[in-house]
């Protein structure tokens, strides 16, 4: 049994998010400066979704997923404030409760990004996200 009050407790929770480096263009829009360099940003969870995952090999019988929308407020290279949100981020995959966990995952990703296949990455993500439900 999943206690949904735990999911509701995630709203407004401060977390740490692994994502691409962000910047602001001259039209004041936030954009991804680098698809190859990831950093850790502090964020706040604004939305929680729990759904039955999807697996290409198993159809609609994949692992359950818990995704969140996070709001990030940070500064760019010039010191100007940047605000953006990231929808559908996976808990324990790109969103972490502690900065130390995010740093460990980022170090792992940086050291293995060129050696893992797409399938291996998805399996690892499914396993880490399933820990939210206590099934991994």
What function would you assign to each model-found segment?
Residues 1-11, 129:
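Mixed-charge, Lys/Arg-rich low-complexity intrinsically disordered regions
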Residues 25-53:
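Short beta-strand-centered aromatic/proline hotspots
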Residues 56-136:
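Intrinsically disordered, low-complexity, charged/polar segments
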């Amino acid at each position: 049994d999943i206690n949904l009050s735990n999911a509701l407790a995630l709203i407004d929770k401060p977390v740490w998010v692994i994502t691409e480096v962000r910047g602001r263009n001259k039209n004041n829009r936030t954009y991804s400066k680098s698809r190859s360099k990831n950093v850790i940003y502090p964020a706040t969870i604004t939305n929680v979704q729990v759904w039955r995952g999807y697996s290409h090999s198993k159809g609609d019988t994949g692992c359950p997923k818990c995704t969140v929308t996070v709001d990030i407020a940070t500064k760019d290279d010039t010191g100007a404030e940047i605000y953006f949100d990231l929808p559908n981020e996976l808990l324990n995959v790109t969103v972490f409760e502690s900065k130390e966990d995010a740093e460990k995952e980022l170090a792992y990703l940086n050291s293995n990004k060129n050696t893992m296949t797409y399938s291996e990455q998805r399996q690892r993500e499914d396993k880490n996200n399933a820990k939210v439900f206590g099934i991994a």
